[in-house]
């Protein structure tokens, strides 16, 4: 059996037939971490390391596991040395999704059919750099070649959205690039919370003295994002909590934290509950899909974090007590306040997949005709793997409606990551194909093909319509 051919990851005849339905579908990449400035300025890359390894903490994490020195990962080593170090790692990375993604990127973007190894690394390095220069590889071309119709970036609440505005005004670029409202610093445990409050007051020209004036200022920023094409918000929580309090305690807590007080866990939970519920009310008002990423235990290697900052490959999946109690209480409270927006919940720890899918099924009722108003998001980060995707789809199929699933997203900082959509589609087709092959569903390729196409693209298009 050959590797990374047209039949890659397609494990049965039904999968091959279903894949014919989805392989040419466009991409609706509703959540990523690309910089809109890079898209607008359309920088031409002249070195493969800048394009392929720079900022990619998946690869960095793998290289550290293979004993590569930090100098050859994020340090002063030459680009060729870094590329060789990655090749040394990749040739031993069987079973890791980076092995598959890398092979697909090399073949489908650059036409490199060989398996990258230490022995051929230097030759392939120079060949890739020549390809970049000869073909003038830039972000817009990579986006167009992948047939990406929509990109949802991840943006700070105080962002001017200058580059989104410029992209929207550029008639030569057809892909929609929309901002996503990501207010991590609005939560009191964040190390930049106090600075954020000061800057929020400056940009909104509001005196923020308590909880209500804080929320009023946040609404002004949400309205600004809405005026500039925003369709979604995002947030990352270590745990899902539900601990209510009154506005008097919130005001007292706000003022104490602004004066340097370090809040305890109960106070953090009370603030998170109150702020998130108010934000959800506003997200529903302004028509934002609300994305919730949860379960990441971040920056665990303190030395590397202090040296390199966040998102450098030292994060873990977490666990928590009473997830379903808190999640049900939170969602029910939002329903009672008529503040439940469309939501996508991304769970990092696969042990909770059935619990999350089961909980979301409690709150699907809506009079808008929205299919799966609350979405169970695709396998995220450490679950963005073959088994992680299958676990998520199993839970959703058993507890909800897989046919309504809005499918894949890159959640990436790399312009080469669109291959992950194809990777997902191949796994999806094998998953559905096994149902057909094992007689678990009718051998109706029209119905199953339509379902696969919806999951690959159309469901997301429909879900993100304002």
From Swiss-Prot:
One GO BP on record is:
D-glucuronate catabolic process
Q: Which Gene3D superfamilies match?
A: Metal-dependent hydrolases, uronate isomerase, domain 2, chain A
A GO molecular function held by the record: glucuronate isomerase activity
Q: Which SUPFAM superfamilies match?
A: Metallo-dependent hydrolases (SSF51556)
**EC primary class:** isomerase
Note whether Isomerase occurs among the keywords.
yes
Pathway-wise, it operates in:
Carbohydrate metabolism; pentose and glucuronate interconversion
UniProt keyword Isomerase present: yes
Protein name, entry field? Uronate isomerase
Species: Streptococcus agalactiae serotype Ia (strain ATCC 27591 / A909 / CDC SS700)
